Amino acid sequence: MIIQFFFTGWDLCATLFGVVGKNKVNMNRPLELSNQHFNKALTRLPLGVTSDFRYWGKDQTIYADHAKGGRLWDIDGNEYIDYRLGYGPCILGYGDERVDAAARAGMNIGGVFALSTERECSVAERIAKMVPAAELVRFSNSGTEAVMAALRLARAYTGKDSYVMVEGGYHGIFDAVAWYTPLKDWDPSQGDPKVTPMSEGIPELIKELLHMVPLNDANRLEELFKKHGDKIGAFLIEPMMGNCCSITATRQYLHDARELCRQHSVIMIVDEVKTGFRVARGGIQELMGFKADLCTFAKAMGNGYPIAAVAGREEFMRLIGDDVIHGGTFTCHSVSLAAAEKTLEILDETAALETINDYGSRLRKGMGGILSRRGIAHSFVGHPSMSGLFFSEVPPSTYRDWAKTDYRFYEALAPELHNHGILCEPDSREPFFLCEAHDQACLDETLDKFERALNVTIKNFGSNSKHVAC
């Protein structure tokens, strides 16, 4: 007998910005100081936070005090093994002495100058060494900015304004990419789900330029290109969807998409904001054996210091400074750039990634064994360094697959994990991020606490679960 969880959930849009307050869980850890600060913060900050994704509900939003290695402490003194890591940036761990020493040296240089420094070239050379598609590089401050630049470049080069995104992908919060396809009330017999803005204030006119396709369906992409290819300038894809359970494009799909883009003069933009320098030294492009026209990086690039990059083929990148504008006051701040230089050196020249991947494989095996012993259907998707946990035997290959089974069981399990000192994202679509500092003690403790939290969750759900024989 295998337990399969099916539930009638709440609108996926509610989880889009981390709003988990509807899933009330008894807190057996003290959050008094976080709750007090939340009420104070509400007087000056919308939702009491400075990013919507940090709001976890009125009584569940926590505030960090400090972090070190793979662990984080909140202001109430609760200690967690952290598998969020700021949504992936801290790939070596919090407060890595090697990177922080480099950052302090960068601080002594002066900060920002409205001039360039020699280090910019050395970091660009490192990126080009690690990622063959990165013939030329321009730096930004965030993944959102890097994707903005890539889309602008693609439109400038092709002279075509329309673009394609993949359902379930995430590319930041600027107007052109802040769209999704809600599936709660979608009827497949009525055609594709409606393309919807993630927020009020995004002009509906933008939708006239946007096309969305399901992942891993090259035929759909080909049909779209044949019909509208003369107007489409860019295909924007996150091959491992970091905000959708790490659902991953197949190698064949990526190679097919690469060829279709070539045939129809569409620029292939690969968003590696989360996968870059994490799943391999050369990112998802190395894993899958293909080269983007343009690609974007951030997250792991600076081990938590704010820095990003857009990179790509020289013929596209040379448009910058000629016909395409790009810049920013804080771009290549001396602290962030020094941190990136050291982080990339470590990732390129040491076994850090192998250490992370080994930990991730052992974590999957341990968690999988615990779930299997209880007859709970499950699968892992993505990469060991950023695993998505899916409560079904068959892993999803598209966003539509993910949405077929609601995630209320995960959404009940996650707060119990928090109670037991394991910090994962309340939103089931965010993967478990790992860092080099996660060690054997972290693994042993994680598996013990995962098992205990799982037992509590199963007990609390009781008759809400349905048993399906497979």
Stretches with model-predicted labels:
Residues L16-N26:
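Short, Lys/Arg-enriched N-terminal segments with co-localized hydrophobic residues
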Residues F5-F7, F17:
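Aromatic (phenylalanine/tyrosine) cluster motif
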Residues M27-C470:
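Conserved N-terminal phosphate-binding loop of PLP-dependent enzymes in the Aspartate aminotransferase
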